[in-house]
Regions:
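Alpha-helix-loop-beta-strand connector modules within alpha/beta enzyme cores
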Residues: 41-49, 68-94, 129-135, 185-195, ...
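Catalytic alpha/beta core domains of metabolic enzymes, predominantly
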Residues: 133, 137-239
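Catalytic beta/alpha-barrel core
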Residues: 73-74, 88-102, 111-124, 135-146, ...
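Structural preference for beta-strand elements that scaffold enzyme active sites
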Residues: 19-23, 52-56, 90-94, 111-112, ...
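A cross-domain feature marking catalytic cores of carbohydrate-active enzymes
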Residues: 26, 55-59, 95-97, 117, ...
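N-terminal amphipathic alpha-helix/helix-capping segment at the start of soluble metabolic enzymes
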Residues: 1-22, 271-274
């Protein structure tokens, strides 16, 4: 059953309570036109399919491989546009924070504070996010087991916040690949919190000598289906009208026009496994 804090989060949406929820959007805020186009199309699609929806976008990418890579259009502008998408389409929003000083600022604009995988053990960051009272979604580090995420959960709870989600995004497999261990989904669910599968970042091919992370987006459907089958409560999918032109993580993104057929299959699968 969906916890009360998620029921409250999705109270403005009409959805099937037995469905998975979706966190989807571009990697980073590029401009107003892109975020509005994605927000409109995904929210309309999710309403049609009865899927609770959260719009996502980073207002700043603080962990790009190369110093020359695009990081954003400015924090204030990025957060304002994320908030504008949420207000226009009546959907909750999420973005990632990278330092404890950002937590209270981002919380004024965003409904769910996301902790990046590389920072999931940073106690000060977890506590600052928790103290905002917002839902905190912690991405499991590529270097951790699902079972070890209990310590991140404990830190947030000790700060007085029970509104927690955990996200699986794969584990390092050699120098330039990731692999998903689906045992991590039930392992993280043992903490009594919703578990999300990041279907795009789990297909990254990091540490490329070009300075640009590669990907394997043709396997997004496979990752998503397996996640639904193993009990994931939600899915995280980055999408873009033209991934080849995206300013960040284009190699991992699902083309926006391919989202509808994918979600239709996943809704059917969800009904078969619950």
């Amino acid at each position: 059953m969906m916890p009360n804090y998620l029921q409250d989060l999705f109270k403005s949406q009409s959805y099937d309570a037995n469905n998975f929820f979706l966190i989807a959007g571009p990697c980073v805020v590029e401009n107003e036109d892109i975020v509005m186009e994605i927000g409109e199309k995904v929210s309309t699609l999710c309403k049609k399919l009865g899927i609770p929806y959260v719009f996502k976008a980073s207002y700043r990418k603080a962990n790009r491989t190369s110093a020359n890579s695009f990081t954003g259009i400015g924090d204030d502008t990025g957060m304002e546009l994320i908030k504008k998408v949420g207000a226009k389409f009546q959907v909750p929003t999420t973005s990632d924070i990278h330092a404890h000083e950002e937590a209270a600022i981002a919380a004024a604009y965003i409904d769910i504070l996301q902790i990046p995988a590389f920072l999931c053990r940073q106690t000060d960051l977890l506590i600052a996010a928790a103290q905002t009272g917002k839902i905190v979604n912690v991405k499991k580090g590529q270097f951790l087991s699902g079972a070890s995420m209990k310590f991140a959960v404990d830190k947030i709870k000790l700060a007085g916040n029970e509104k927690i989600m955990l996200t699986e995004r794969g584990n390092t497999f050699g120098y330039q690949d990731l692999v998903v261990d689906y045992r991590n989904i039930p392992a993280m669910a043992e903490n009594g919190v919703p578990v999300i599968m990041d279907c795009t970042h789990s297909l990254q091919q990091p540490n490329q000598t070009s300075g640009v992370t590669g990907g394997n987006p043709q396997l997004i459907e496979t990752i998503a289906k397996a996640a639904i089958a193993t009990g994931a409560h939600g899915l995280f999918i980055e999408t873009h009208p033209n991934p080849a032109q995206a300013k960040s993580d284009g190699a991992n993104m699902l083309p926006l026009d391919k989202l509808a057929p994918l979600l239709e299959k996943l809704v059917k699968l969800r009904k078969a496994v619950i």
